[in-house]
Amino acid sequence: MKKITPKSFEEALSRLESLTQSMQGEMPLEDALAAYQEGNELVRYCQTKLAQVEQKLQVLDADGPKELNLESDE
């Protein structure tokens, strides 16, 4: 099976939704297995992307939350 490399998280999520829809209908067994395998690869890709974003957010928030001042000093 070839390695799945979506261009973005959103593309992977869209493909997962499409696979889910197609698997809910009538599908030959071999096609269903291939769709399941592709779905697993896409889920792993999405989980990795989410973990990377979470890690970046933790780095950005390392100094703790900042107070937001919405009042202008005019």
Swiss-Prot record:
Gene3D superfamilies in UniProt: Exonuclease VII, small subunit (1.10.287.1040)
Gene Ontology MF annotations: exodeoxyribonuclease VII activity
A biological-process GO annotation: DNA catabolic process
Catalytic reaction list: Exonucleolytic cleavage in either 5'- to 3'- or 3'- to 5'-direction to yield nucleoside 5'-phosphates
Enzyme Commission identifier(s): 3.1.11.6
Ranges that cross the membrane: none
One CC-aspect GO term: exodeoxyribonuclease VII complex
Entry keyword set: Cytoplasm, Exonuclease, Hydrolase, Nuclease
Location within or outside the cell: Cytoplasm
Pfam families: Exonuc_VII_S (PF02609)
SUPFAM superfamilies xref list: XseB-like
HAMAP family given in the database record: Exonuc_7_S
Family: Belongs to the XseB family.
Subunit details: Heterooligomer composed of large and small subunits.
PANTHER family, per the entry: EXODEOXYRIBONUCLEASE 7 SMALL SUBUNIT (PTHR34137:SF1)
Role description: Bidirectionally degrades single-stranded DNA into large acid-insoluble oligonucleotides, which are then degraded further into small acid-soluble oligonucleotides.
Name of this protein: Exodeoxyribonuclease 7 small subunit
Gene: xseB
